[in-house]
Curated annotation (Swiss-Prot):
The chain crosses the membrane at residues 7-27. It comes from Sus scrofa (Pig). Cell surface glycoprotein receptor involved in the costimulatory signal essential for T-cell receptor (TCR)-mediated T-cell activation. Acts as a positive regulator of T-cell coactivation, by binding at least ADA, CAV1, IGF2R, and PTPRC. Its binding to CAV1 and CARD11 induces T-cell proliferation and NF-kappa-B activation in a T-cell receptor/CD3-dependent manner. Its interaction with ADA also regulates lymphocyte-epithelial cell adhesion. It comes from the Eukaryota. Residues 1-6 are cytoplasmic. Disulfide bonds join 385-394, 444-447, 454-472, 649-762. This is Dipeptidyl peptidase 4. The soluble form (Dipeptidyl peptidase 4 soluble form also named SDPP) derives from the membrane form (Dipeptidyl peptidase 4 membrane form also named MDPP) by proteolytic processing.
């Protein structure tokens, strides 16, 4: 979803409070401001569904401090960042000779072997199984001895050499040599019960955002892993209908802890791989959590190897307002990992929860004696603090009414980070460098490189940060460049999307306006995607596109081609989004405003913002709609159920309808427990079902996939039942065997076509 936007402030006669430079007009309505004289075609629904216009990316893989791999025309090329020359690392003919289509590849750190991934089968958001072959780069042939089993869940090279660790059937195996047999590390794995080295559903989705729960030490001496026990976790069950020839549907069962339910338990172990041999038993040493979290339910939420014999674990209480970093050292004489209270660092939130979605990871100096971490300062903004490992207090090295998004690289002299400081725009991202011996010496490395085109960056650094790739995502066409850290010089353009630029000159594209409105004495950001040749003297239908979950951000300077592009370009609909209370990257005061009260302020603010939009003079207040997906579907439904009279219709896709139906980690982070002693009243007051009667005043389309493992079909089923019981006339659409993304090819086309028809009917469009 990529859109060529022109960012306009104050275009509509509204005072612009900050300056945003527009992207080149070539991306927009080049040639005329007269709609009647513009004969170019618009961006159509078919363009979106068929991806007629494709953005090019440049995904590189650093393998040293000056070299990276890049796949081009099925050749794997090795590039030298310093000189710009390249050589073929692996020919495309090698892939042809395999006899199967590969999904991915991974080169061993010593460059002797390459791992080919194929037979990819998706499981949940991050997890999948696959088959793997190992290719010997010296002999130029596949290794056929002691092959890795099919349906492997995860596999990873050691950081040096070519040892492999992998997970199969929820147990961990290590290969010291690719052609030798594997050594089994664990024996307790059991489907849906015990997970070794991979995450269960809730840890994958809400804690690690990953399937892997394996961590090699820097030199590959030790292998750390987590074990999750879901014995007491209740199962969610749903039917999977599969092919029509199946007489009885399959039943999918997933351990899924809902709010207030039994959670998985977690243990953490370290194995010394030097002791592995075919005839020896394997000893895994368990590191127990600190007593302050061990006293109750808790989560493992971060693992960082500091040195070869020092590891940092981060734990958090179930309430998620108290976390602790525990730094443990290896005692060679006993083979134990020793924790010390002096090396424990506590982080507490008194206004909400720790971190954004989880506590930030620590970034350690090379000697392992100190680290940098993003935490909230006294004013409630996320900034970088410098900790000594044996001291509890820290020194903030950044400050201001803006937030650090992430630490990108750390050297002996500098720390590189992404923030939204530039021009006070929460929806921007730029790369900064701070000098570690003088925190006042801060340089923005990206702010002035291409200010019209690029205001939203990410970065990828080489192994020791000698070089970095800058990835510009908007507001103009995406741009990928390579830079030297020593001079900050741009070495070369990797991808500029010039071909797409040329194609879009023949299309009438929308423009994008970012500005602020005032609610409750606070300035909040909104964006509007405006039709081509926008005329403020005319009246346009308005669609609010909402998410509004905790720490969300819908207003940004990212380039997208999306459903909204079609609606604005072809149907002349204004598509607006608004970040109100509860949204992220603007300080804890705004983000924590909805703490323990989901479904309140973030819903009210969408209604009030829309009221203000309707008074701007160019909105047809009789044709206002709202739509959202997931949390956005929840907010859409709560807004429509509020009976405000502002909205004519709305679409909710895969919505939450009752927080007691959603998973424990996410829900309890913001709502606490659904018990009388804790927060049961707010749980009960935040259901969509309780607002069913008010849906008689609006047109409502409810959509859900029957195989949604995340927001279960139960949520829409119970909401539908409540609407029927209230005598509400509404529309609904389900997608058989589709998960939360409803992303299979035909379902994707069907849902957006169906929503388009619904919206055009609501707005009385031809």
């Amino acid at each position: 979803m990529k859109t060529p936007w022109k960012v306009l402030l104050g275009l509509l006669g509204i005072a612009a409070l900050v300056t945003v430079i527009t992207v080149p007009v070539v991306l927009l309505n080049k040639g005329t401001d007269d709609a009647a004289a513009d004969s170019r075609r618009t961006y159509t629904l078919t363009d979106y569904l068929k991806s007629t216009f494709r953005v090019k990316f440049y995904t590189l893989q650093w393998i040293s401090d000056h070299e990276y791999l890049y796949k081009q025309e099925n050749n794997i090329l090795l590039f030298n960042a310093e000189y710009g020359n390249s050589s073929i690392f692996l020919e495309n003919s090698t892939f042809d000779e395999l006899g199967y289509s590969t999904n991915d590849y991974s080169v061993s750190p010593d460059r002797q072997f390459i791992l080919f991934e194929y037979n990819y089968v998706k499981q949940w958001r991050h997890s999948y199984t696959a088959s793997y072959d190992i290719y010997d780069l010296n002999k130029r042939q596949l290794i056929t001895e002691e092959r890795i089993p099919n349906n492997t869940q995860w596999i990873t090279w050691s950081p040096v050499g070519h040892k492999l660790a992998y997970v199969w059937n929820n147990d961990i195996y290590v290969k010291n040599e690719p052609n030798l047999s594997s050594q089994r590390i664990t024996w307790t794995g059991k489907e849906n019960v015990i997970y070794n080295g991979v995450t269960d559903w809730v840890y994958e989705e809400e804690v690690f955002s990953a399937y892997s729960a394996l961590w090699w030490s820097p030199n590959g001496t030790f292998l750390a892993y987590a074990q999750f026990n879901d014995t007491e976790v209740p199962l969610i069950e749903y039917s999977f209908y599969s092919d029509e020839s199946l007489q009885y549907p399959k039943t999918v069962r997933i351990p899924y802890p809902k709010a207030g339910a039994e959670n998985p338990t977690v243990k953490f172990f370290v194995v010394d791989t030097r002791t592995l041999s075919p005839n020896a038993s394997v000893t895994s040493y368990q590191i127990v959590p600190p007593a302050s979290v061990l006293i109750g339910d808790h989560y493992l939420c971060g693992v960082t190897w500091v040195t070869e014999e020092r590891i940092s674990l981060q734990w958090i209480r179930r309430a998620q307002n108290y976390s602790i970093i525990d730094i443990c050292d290896y005692d060679e004489s006993t083979g134990r990992w020793i924790s010390s209270v002096a090396r424990q660092h506590i982080e507490i939130s008194t206004t909400g929860w720790v971190g954004r979605f989880r506590p930030a990871e620590p970034h350690f100096t090379s000697d392992g004696n100190s680290f940098y971490k993003i935490i909230s300062n006294e004013e409630g903004y996320k900034h970088i603090c410098h900790f000594q490992t044996d001291k509890s207090n820290c020194t903030f090295i950044t400050k201001g009414a803006w937030e650090v998004i992430g630490i990108e690289a750390l050297t002996s002299d500098y720390l590189y980070y992404i923030s939204n400081e530039h021009k006070g725009m929460p929806g921007g991202r730029n790369l900064y460098r701070i000098q570690l011996n003088d925190y006042t010496k801060v340089t923005c490395l990206s702010c002035e490189l291409n200010p019209e085109r690029c205001q939203y960056y990410s970065a990828s650094f080489s192994n020791k940060a000698k070089y970095y790739q800058l990835r510009c995502f908007g507001p103009g066409l995406p741009l990928y460049t390579l830079h030297s850290s020593s001079s900050d010089k741009e070495l070369r353009v990797l991808e500029d999307n010039s071909a797409l630029d040329k194609m879009l000159q023949d299309v009438q594209m929308p423009s994008k306006k970012l500005d602020v409105i005032n609610l409750h004495g606070t300035k909040f950001w909104y964006q509007m995607i405006l039709p081509p040749h926008f005329d403020k003297s005319k009246k346009y239908p308005l669609l609010i596109e909402v998410y509004a979950g905790p720490c969300s951000q819908k207003v940004d300077t990212v380039f997208r081609l999306s459903w909204a592009t079609y609606l604005a370009s072809t149907e002349n609909i204004i598509v607006a989004s608004f970040d109100g209370r509860g949204s992220g990257y603007q300080g804890d005061k705004i983000m924590h405003a909805i703490n323990r009260r989901l479904g309140t302020f973030e819903v009210e603010d969408q209604i009030e913002a829309t009221r203000q939009f309707s008074k701007m003079g160019f909105v047809d207040d009789k044709r206002i709609a709202i739509w959202g997906w997931s949390y956005g579907g929840y907010v859409t439904s709560m807004v429509l159920g509020a009976g405000s009279g502002v909205f004519k219709c709305g679409i909710a896709v895969a919505p939450v309808s009752k927080w007691e139906y959603y998973d424990s980690v996410y829900t309890e982070r913001y709502m606490g427990l659904p018990t009388p002693e804790d927060n049961l009243d707010y749980y009960r007051n935040s259901t969509v079902m309780s607002r069913a009667e008010n849906f008689k005043q609006v047109e409502y389309l409810l959509i859900h996939g029957t195989a949604d493992d995340n927001v279960h079909f139960q949520q829409s089923a119970q909401l539908s039942k409540a609407l029927v019981d209230a005598g509400v006339d509404f529309q609904t659409m389900w997608y058989t065997d589709e998960d939360h993304g409803i992303a299979s090819n035909m379902a994707h086309q069907h849902i957006y076509t169906h929503m388009s028809h619904f919206l055009k009917q609501c707005f009385s469009l031809p």
